[in-house]
Design a protein with these regions (language model features):
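C-terminal region of N-terminal signal peptides and the immediate post-cleavage residues
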Residues: 15-30
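Bacterial N-terminal signal peptides
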Residues: 8-16
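Bacterial N-terminal signal peptides that target proteins for export
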Residues: 1-8
Length: 139
């Protein structure tokens, strides 16, 4: 009995000094949808925050889980020919897989966000073209 009381007291002492994990960190996983806000199952994701040259619209998600999200969308990509300012946007259907969950800093309420995307585009004459994108916490 004495041993059980000491064990319970020790556990309470340990738990009281442990840092608390925010509730948001334990639950849902978000993605930076437009470089300024988080979303779950967004229909729009901007992959290139600097110039807006690669983004998706009409996103539909077949699955959205803590560690992986899978969906399809229309992807719009600037060919940057002759330059990115004078380039042409091409639209293609494709699939997206979000993965690599990380916690954003305090300013973002410790939210868990997907930081990697694998995008497979259905390109005429070329078949499937795969891109990898790095997503980040909000700017």
């Amino acid at each position: 009995m004495k041993r059980a009381v000491m064990l319970a007291g020790t556990l309470v002492a340990i738990w009281s000094v442990m840092p608390l994990v925010p509730v948001a960190a334990q639950g849902r996983t978000y993605v930076s949808s437009n470089c300024t806000r988080f979303a779950i199952r967004p229909s729009y994701i901007l992959f290139t925050c600097a110039d807006g040259g690669f983004y998706m619209t009409q996103g539909e998600w077949a699955g959205w889980h803590r560690y992986r999200a899978v969906g399809s969308a229309l992807f719009h990509r600037n060919d940057c020919t002759p330059s990115c300012a004078g380039g042409t946007f091409h639209t293609m259907r494709g699939r997206i897989v979000l993965h690599d969950r990380e916690r954003c800093p305090d300013a973002h309420r410790h939210r868990q966000v997907f930081t990697r995307a694998i995008i497979t585009l259905d390109v005429r004459l070329l078949g499937h073209v795969r891109y990898r994108a790095h997503l980040q916490c909000l700017l």
